[in-house]
């Protein structure tokens, strides 16, 4: 190193240090002889015992060399690098490992035990011997890879050496001695991870099987996280333990921070870049952390003059120095201009110094605006000195810490400083000098290269420097001014240059603009610098980039992030964009950041760029203002070969991830059917030209995984080949003529008619279903299937899962003892295909699944367990249900139900699975047993209640009919009696599931039995009542109207209201000539006058019922009969023909409003169906009794022709008619 400095000084003649003699030896200061002794300082000698140059040098050298071999280096680079490592860590002479250990011991003033020291050093020596042997065997094999013997030796040594490291690492992490051993641990961990990388680089060539390579790779990933978190945790522990109260403790604290950043954290930041699957080509990494060399102040005062050391000269407190010197987290910037202000400290004309008392520093981020900071006193009478740093790397500073004595008061300041610079864009270099003048004072030289030496001594320091000056702060006291230089690693370039032939990592603190809500925060210790934190919903930051290609080239983009919730991210570079892409959460809310918290947001859609561009990152789904952390952005150049290799590695990783590590013939927990389809798409899109054999092998594995998925799925027809397909073997209950829905539901899907099955699209590889909305919540869109009891295992948890492309108001139920229910709203997108990519349609119209596409929320799992609310916006969903004991006779099973009951609702879903998850243990087992017992107790109570209600309902139904043939009504049976019996039938609870009333419940069979007889009764009653719509439930349908009349709702009944005497309502009715009929009318008269209901034939034979407001109700006989051969022709057509016949004889207002409504409208049963106000197609109307004031009158009528007319009118006031019946008498 000395030769390099000499070389530099010979080239730069103007850089010689001023010849400032030590006048103190010649001075005669009789007033205070001690002043002379206090000024005796050997210039140029820094004897601070805390600094160990060899320790720092080794750490810097190793980190610098590693930066050059990241990703997949050339074989020659690896051989050379390992030779370098062995020479650095196991050289001839004193053991560097012992120096690492002693250096940290001195900093923290804690020594490890002798046993720990001896054991660690002995084990390290053994590792060194083995590593040297491995390195030599690797070189031999790289020279002749076909040599079987060399390959065999290398294979054996590799396995043994990796195992040695695995066993040795705990010896460098002894409890209560973690901090002093930390630098040893970090260097050993680095070697272990580099060794594990060799399995991916060379393993297949020197004999490792694919399973062994995968195992070593997984160990590398695991150990990377373990070693990173360990080093960061114990670094922070050691640093916090050194936190003190005074300036001297701060000096030691800062030295620990600096030296262990160089020897530990810089290595840790590079660990993830050893992953050859993530970095399959040469990779450029950057360290943006900032470190601080020691303050430029006297530290080597002679014995007895300790007060002249800067930290004893009334220096500020620990916390004051930390606040003044250490910059808060910030964007990376570069100094452009330094203006130094000076004051004079004079004892005499022969003892004085003009020294640095304050400064103003102008800095700029990459492509950002200029910022200015001032420190110390800038209001002085001496002309300031201005130094220009624009586009210059200051790689070395040389500064004098001056000491002057005024009477008994020491003055600490810097009278002279030199800044050696180099322009990294060209060969220019030089130096800048600060000095105003000084003489007769003591000086101590501080050379930054003592604390931050170059990466190598083999080249001049202006080429091999490791750090550049980034900022200057100032420690200020009454008679103290001590500048502190901060430095960044030279790997953090000034231009954010993106390479066209290697992966480029750009830390996001190299941005030039952060939008509101975004800030820089301290890194967790393993990121190589500070990171970005944001809670914005929109644009996050902007940064300048320089692509070294002049023509457009495509790059893949990925962002390293940590998030406690799902995130939709977009990166824009110039006019090219990745489009929005969804990424899952990586950590829990309020969890501390660890290496496990970070993962890559990798965009499948690349960008095209060249030259100078501006890049931006934005988030589009953070309405809740959640916090996200970003570390860096990476650009991977895309070439045909790289793309094929990248796709192959991605597909291999995806296929391997389908199966468990212990059993490659068993699916891993959490692998879904949709996931398998997605992996099959990856494999199918592999290049036949580059990897045909691998593609075939992977395709066989994926097919096997799909078969395993099909075998475990308990759903019938999960691929939606049909809906509502009747099996050939469904049984029928002969007594009730009731098809066993339980049986048919166990053999496929059943649903409403508006559901459609669609072939696969760009989201689904297989069939999927579309569930539209509905206009009436009582008639929802539904899809269901039953998992039969025989398919289930006792005391087991099962999981329903699937993929939802998009949905709104989609309700999902799993029903056994009770219902597990979730409502999911999953937003979709108009297209998953970016506008900039090729057409997503194949030659035959099929989706081109190999075209680049983006997803809005991929792989976001929504697992709903034990009543938890399922997060919205999750395309993957899962819902669990627990099964207790199995009862094949009861056949309770599990109902799987999808339902939409809103007009706006909709859903597109597929890849549905119902699979066994795990046996129930502990609390879950106890919980399902309690639920089962509660359900059985409820069932027993229901059975007792059902027996009573059924008996009452059956008696009422039987009373409607003449006998048990149920084909003739009793003569006195009227519509009110039928509805009263129907109401009793509907008191039978749990005839159908409240969640979906087309699914039968435990009492469905007896309900359908009685309900069928009610329907028969209504049919028979309709057959003998020849008046159509006589209860006006269908408005004025089948009636002819003259004048103004209306059908209104009164007491929950439909009534005809005739408010004017000139109005008239009539109906022509066909009858059986010579037979007897009873005309029965229930009505109410308001006001004066009479209400009249007249029956007549076309010329004569007229009779009439009259209603008045002040008369008593009369009782009429109710004998009725049937006209079976005629009523078979009654219906809508007959109604229309009767009206037509009537129009031939009478004038009819054919424009009268007709508001049709179903004859038996569904209504709410608040007394028996509290959990569901909709009864689907059950034929029951809540028929209330006739209100007080209404009268029922009857007359007998014997028509002589086949047609009669019934007319309704009044003389004045208002006439309200509840019903009109014309009943055929029995013969």
Curated annotation (Swiss-Prot):
Key words, A-Z: Plasmid, Sporulation, Toxin, Virulence
Protein's organism: Bacillus thuringiensis
Its family remark reads:
Belongs to the delta endotoxin family.
Q: Which GO terms describe its biological process?
A: sporulation resulting in formation of a cellular spore; symbiont-mediated killing of host cell
Does the entry annotate any disulfide bonds, and if so which pairs?
A: none
This chain's protein is named Pesticidal crystal protein Cry1Be
Q: Which PANTHER family match?
A: ENDOTOXIN_N DOMAIN-CONTAINING PROTEIN-RELATED, PESTICIDAL CRYSTAL PROTEIN N-TERMINAL DOMAIN-CONTAINING PROTEIN
Other remarks on this protein: Toxic segment of the protein is located in the N-terminus.
Q: Which domain of life is it from?
A: Bacteria
* InterPro entries named among the record's database cross-references: Cry1Ac-like_dom-VII (IPR048645), Cry_V (IPR041587), Galactose-bd-like_sf (IPR008979), Pest_crys (IPR038979), Pest_crys_Cry1Aa_dom-IV (IPR054544), Pest_crys_dom-III (IPR005638), Pest_crys_dom_I (IPR005639), Pest_crys_N_sf (IPR036716)
Q: Cross-referenced Pfam families, in alphabetical order?
A: Cry1Ac_D5, Cry1Ac_dom-VII, Endotoxin_C, Endotoxin_C2, Endotoxin_M, Endotoxin_N
Which molecular-function annotation in GO is an example for this chain?
Answer: toxin activity
Protein role:
Promotes colloidosmotic lysis by binding to the midgut epithelial cells of many lepidopteran larvae.
Source taxonomy lineage?
Bacteria, Bacillati, Bacillota, Bacilli, Bacillales
């Amino acid at each position: 190193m000395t030769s390099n400095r000499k070389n530099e000084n010979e080239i730069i003649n103007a850089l010689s240090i001023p010849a400032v003699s030590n006048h103190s030896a010649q001075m005669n200061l009789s007033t205070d002889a001690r002043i002379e002794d206090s000024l005796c300082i050997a210039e140029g000698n820094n004897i601070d015992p805390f600094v160990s140059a060899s320790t720092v040098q080794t750490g810097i050298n190793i980190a610098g060399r590693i930066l050059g071999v990241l990703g997949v280096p050339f074989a020659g680079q690896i051989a050379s690098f390992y030779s370098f490592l062995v020479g650095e860590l196991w050289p001839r002479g004193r053991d560097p490992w012992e120096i690492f250990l002693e250096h940290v011991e001195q900093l923290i003033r804690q020594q490890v035990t002798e046993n720990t020291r001896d054991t660690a050093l002995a084990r390290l020596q053994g590792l060194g011997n083995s590593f040297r042997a491995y390195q030599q065997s690797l070189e031999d094999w790289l020279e002749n890879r076909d040599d079987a013997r060399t390959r065999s030796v290398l294979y054996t040594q590799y396995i043994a050496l990796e195992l040695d490291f695995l066993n040795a690492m705990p010896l460098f992490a002894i409890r209560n001695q973690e901090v002093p051993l930390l630098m040893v641990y970090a260097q050993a961990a680095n070697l272990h991870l580099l060794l594990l990388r060799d399995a991916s680089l060379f393993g297949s060539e020197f004999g490792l099987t694919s399973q062994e390579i995968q195992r070593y790779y997984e160990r590398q990933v695991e150990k990377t996280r373990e070693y990173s978190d360990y080093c960061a945790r114990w670094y922070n522990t050691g640093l916090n333990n050194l936190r003190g109260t005074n300036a001297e403790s701060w000096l030691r604290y800062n030295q620990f921070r600096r030296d262990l950043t160089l020897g530990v954290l810089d290595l840790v930041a590079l660990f993830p870049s050893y992953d050859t699957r993530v970095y399959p080509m040469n990779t450029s990494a950057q360290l943006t952390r900032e470190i601080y060399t020691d303050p430029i102040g006297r530290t080597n005062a002679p014995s007895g003059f300790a007060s002249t050391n800067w930290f004893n000269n009334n220096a500020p407190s620990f916390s004051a120095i930390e606040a003044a010197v250490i910059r808060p987290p910030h964007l990376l910037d570069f100094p452009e201009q330094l203006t130094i202000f000076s004051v004079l400290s004079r004892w005499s004309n022969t003892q004085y110094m003009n020294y640095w008392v304050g400064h103003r520093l102008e800095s700029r981020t990459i492509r950002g605006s200029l910022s200015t900071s001032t420190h110390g006193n800038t209001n002085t009478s001496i002309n300031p000195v201005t130094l220009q740093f624009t586009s210059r790397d200051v790689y070395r500073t040389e500064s004098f810490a001056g000491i002057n004595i005024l009477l008994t008061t020491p003055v600490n300041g810097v009278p002279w400083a030199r800044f050696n610079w180099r322009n990294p864009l060209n060969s220019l270099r030089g130096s800048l000098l600060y000095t105003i003048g000084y003489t007769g004072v003591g000086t101590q030289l501080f050379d930054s290269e003592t604390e931050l030496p170059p990466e190598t001594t083999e080249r001049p320091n202006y080429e091999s420097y490791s750090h550049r000056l980034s900022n200057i702060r100032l420690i200020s006291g009454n008679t103290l001014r001590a500048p502190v230089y901060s430095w960044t690693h030279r790997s953090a370039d000034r231009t954010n240059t993106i390479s066209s032939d290697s992966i480029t990592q750009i830390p996001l603190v190299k941005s030039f603009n952060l939008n509101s809500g975004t800030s820089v925060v301290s890194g967790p210790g393993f990121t190589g610098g500070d990171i970005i934190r944001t809670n914005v919903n929109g644009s996050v930051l902007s940064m300048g980039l320089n692509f070294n290609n002049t023509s457009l080239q495509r790059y893949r983009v990925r962002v390293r992030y940590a998030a406690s919730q799902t995130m939709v991210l977009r990166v824009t570079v110039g006019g090219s964009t990745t489009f929005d892409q969804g990424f899952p959460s990586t950590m829990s809310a309020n969890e501390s950041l660890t290496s496990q918290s970070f993962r890559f947001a990798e965009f499948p859609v690349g960008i095209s760029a060249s030259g100078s561009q501006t890049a931006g990152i934005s988030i589009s789904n953070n309405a809740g203002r959640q916090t996200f952390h970003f570390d860096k952005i990476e650009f991977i150049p895309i070439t045909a070969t790289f793309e094929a290799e990248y796709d192959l590695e991605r597909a291999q990783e995806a296929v391997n991830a389908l199966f468990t590590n212990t059993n490659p013939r068993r699916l891993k927990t959490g692998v879904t059917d949709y996931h398998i389809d997605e992996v099959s798409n990856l494999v199918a899109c592999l290049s036949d030209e580059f990897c045909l054999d691998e593609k075939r092998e992977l395709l066989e594995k994926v097919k096997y995984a799909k078969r395993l998925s099909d075998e475990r799925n308990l759903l019938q027809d999960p691929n939606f080949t049909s809906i509502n397909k009747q099996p050939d073997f469904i049984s029928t209950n002969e007594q009730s003529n009731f098809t066993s829905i339980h049986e048919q539901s166990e053999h496929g899907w059943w649903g409403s008619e508006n559901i459609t099955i669609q072939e696969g699209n760009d989201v689904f590889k297989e069939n999927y279903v579309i569930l539209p909305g509905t206009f009436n919540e009582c008639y929802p869109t539904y899809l269901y299937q039953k998992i039969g009891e025989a398919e289930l295992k006792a005391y087991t948890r099962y999981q329903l899962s699937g993929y939802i492309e998009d949905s709104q108001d989609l309700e999902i139920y799993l029903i056994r003892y009770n219902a597990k229910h979730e409502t999911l709203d999953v937003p979709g997108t108009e297209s998953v295909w970016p506008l900039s990519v090729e057409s997503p349609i194949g030659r035959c119209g099929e989706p081109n699944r190999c075209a680049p596409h983006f997803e809005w929320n991929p792989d976001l799992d929504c697992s709903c367990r034990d009543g938890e609310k399922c997060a919205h916006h999750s395309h993957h969903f899962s819902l669990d249900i627990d099964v207790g004991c199995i009862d094949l006779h009861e056949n309770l099973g599990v109902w799987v139900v999808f339902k939409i009951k809103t007009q706006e609702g909709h859903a597109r879903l597929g890849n549905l699975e119902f699979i066994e998850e795990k046996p129930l243990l502990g609390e879950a087992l106890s919980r399902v047993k309690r639920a089962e017992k509660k359900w059985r107790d409820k069932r027993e109570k229901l059975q007792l209640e059902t027996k009573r209600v059924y008996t009452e309902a059956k008696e009422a139904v039987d009373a409607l009919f003449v006998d048990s043939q149920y084909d003739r009504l009793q003569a006195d049976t009227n519509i009110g009696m039928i509805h009263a019996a129907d109401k009793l039938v509907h008191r039978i609870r749990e005839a159908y599931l409240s969640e979906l009333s087309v699914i039968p419940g435990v009492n469905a069979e007896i309900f359908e039995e009685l309900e069928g007889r009610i329907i028969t009764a209504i049919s028979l009653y309709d057959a003998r009542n020849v008046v159509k719509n006589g209860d006006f439930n269908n408005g004025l349908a089948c009636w002819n109207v003259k004048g103004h009349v209306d059908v209104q709702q009164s007491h929950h009944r439909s009534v005809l209201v005739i408010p004017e005497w000139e109005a008239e309502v009539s109906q022509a009715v066909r009858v059986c000539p010579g037979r007897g009929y009873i005309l029965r009318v229930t009505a109410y008269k308001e006001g004066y006058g009479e209400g009249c209901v007249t029956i007549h034939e076309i010329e004569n034979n007229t009779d009439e019922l009259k209603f008045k407001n002040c008369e008593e109700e009369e009782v009429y006989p109710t004998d009725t009969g049937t006209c079976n051969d005629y009523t078979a022709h009654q219906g809508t057509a007959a109604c229309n023909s009767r009206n037509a016949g009537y129009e031939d004889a009478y004038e009819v207002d054919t424009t009268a409003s007709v508001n049709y409504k179903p004859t038996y409208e569904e209504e709410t049963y608040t007394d028996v169906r509290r959990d569901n106000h909709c009864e689907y197609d059950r034929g029951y109307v809540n028929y209330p009794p006739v209100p007080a004031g209404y009268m029922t009158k009857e007359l007998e009528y014997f028509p002589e022709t086949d047609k009669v007319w019934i007319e309704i009118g009044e003389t004045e006031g208002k006439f309200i008619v509840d019903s009109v019946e014309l009943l055929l008498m029995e013969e």
